[in-house]
Design a protein with these regions (language model features):
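Adenine nucleotide phosphate-binding catalytic loops in nucleotide-utilizing enzymes
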Residues: 119-126, 156-253
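Beta-strand C-termini and the immediately following turn/loop, strongest in propeller blades
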Residues: 1-2, 176
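Phosphate-binding loop of NTP-binding sites
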Residues: 2-146, 150-159, 210, 216-217
């Protein structure tokens, strides 16, 4: 654990009878008192949740956010809003932590087996994600990457959408890559936003961006705000993070 049981400060709080909760339990409480927008998945969740948080934070809606990486836009993994009903959360599957959550909406990016020291088998790992989908609140939505080996088990009243780079209810079209830039058109069931520039022009961010934009679109972030937010997104520290980028040398931290 990050803090051993014999740590002096932890021992003090135990001795004085304070209630002590894990981070995941606290986040669960927060999702039951706000509209939790949670991003789960083996990989892609940190970038996607940070991107979604930026889309909301720079819009007229705003958000609170608890992220798994340091946003390069804000220099922190915590965003606070006094007025927004939305909380963007990176939903961590380690130790089944995401089972404490009660999402209003959730993205699932990937279900490649991981943390097998906890889960033991691929089947147990997938079952954990299936159970997670049962926690989404009626009236909310699941946005799941198209083609995953996961059968969602959502409650009645939960909408299910698919997404990916090239197909699904939400996807990208007219992808243009050149001169160090990426432009896409974002396609949703009820709209299309043309000529979106990715602030971090990396191929995988097309798919991550589609998921983040889907979450934003379904919750009232305007087309123009989405377009501006994607262009101004600067990425996440140590997630395909360019430290040196010259004509002779590229050095990445990831």
């Amino acid at each position: 654990p990050a803090i051993p049981q014999e740590h002096a400060e932890l021992a003090y709080f135990h001795e004085k009878g304070f209630e002590i909760q894990k981070r995941s339990q606290v986040l669960g409480t927060i999702t039951r008192s706000s509209k939790g927008l949670c991003v789960a998945g083996t990989h892609g969740k940190t970038t996607t949740s940070t991107m979604a948080a930026h889309l909301f934070h720079q819009s007229h809606i705003g958000c609170t956010a608890f992220l798994g990486g340091i946003s390069k836009n804000y220099g922190t993994n915590l965003l606070l809003s006094q007025t927004s009903p939305y909380t963007v959360i990176e939903a961590d599957e380690f130790d089944r932590s995401f089972h404490w959550l009660s999402p209003y909406m959730s993205v699932i990016t990937a279900t490649d087996p991981d943390h097998l020291d906890i889960y033991g088998t691929r089947e147990a790992y997938l079952e954990s994600f299936r159970h997670y989908t049962t926690l989404i609140q009626p009236g909310g939505a699941l946005i799941i990457r198209k083609g995953l080996a996961l059968q969602p088990d959502v409650q009645p009243g939960v909408r299910v959408y698919t997404y990916s780079r090239d197909e699904g209810d939400f996807h990208a079209e007219n992808i243009r890559i050149g001169n160090g830039e990426i432009f896409i058109d974002f396609v949703a069931p009820d709209t299309r936003i043309n000529d979106i520039r990715l602030g971090v022009p990396i191929g995988i961010n097309i798919e991550n961006g589609v998921a983040a934009m889907a979450l934003a679109h379904l919750n009232g972030v305007t087309d123009e705000e989405i377009k501006q937010g994607m262009a101004s997104f600067r990425g996440v520290d140590r997630r395909f993070d360019f430290k040196i980028k010259t004509s002779r040398l590229v050095f990445l931290s990831d």
